[in-house]
Amino acid sequence: MISTENLTKRFGRKTILHGISLRADAKQITLMVGPNGAGKSTTIKVLAGLIRPNSGTAHVNGFDIIKRRIAAQRSTAYLPQRPSFHPKLTCLEVLRFYAGLRGVPVSRCEAMLQLAGLGDAARMHTEKLSGGMRQLLGVAFLLLADAPVLLLDEPGLSLDPGWRKWLQQKLRFEAERGKTILVTTHLIAEWNDVADRCLLCRHGVIERELDPRNLPDDFDEIDSSTKRPEFTSIEKELTRNGGLFSITR
């Protein structure tokens, strides 16, 4: 389970998170959607323990991310939007290194590569991987430790539709096994049949919850659904006229 209360985060003078409060439950896939700069990726990084919030609280698998930082991090697996690996190591070598850090039997590494469709690339150096293969290696990392909480930031952007569908089905399977899964995405319509909940993030807060069974194709449709009816068919033009402002309909 994931829970946050009034999380804030500033970078210099710019505030990115203005009070994020959310809950994601076990056995569910929770989406976080919203425009660029809404705070989705920052929230994921806070939960993964990569950056520290300025205020607020967050718990991952029951552990406070500040007071029980190590326990919280061991409870999570994180897939960044653009996974990066040591360029001179092979896929199998980097996975074995990660397995050692997480206390996972190295015998699982080759099985994870096979699962992610990278069995034939096990001894390929990561610098030679395509964007899609790099993303799949990230998925192998995500699943290797069998962590109870999975955090995914824009998964599948580098994957073709077939592999994106495979990833969604795999995450559905992991949720049914009891995992808590939080996903940020711009490909919102593709998750209609997969997600259990969908949170709309905008301006550093969770604005509202959307129906995951009826997600639109893009954010313009979300925006139009939230406008007041009297303004949807009115085109306003603000012009300066003799020092006065007038609105022309």
Question: For the regions a protein language model found, what residue spans apply to each?
Answer:
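Helix N-cap at the start of a conserved alpha-helix in ABC-type nucleotide-binding domains
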Residues: P161-W163
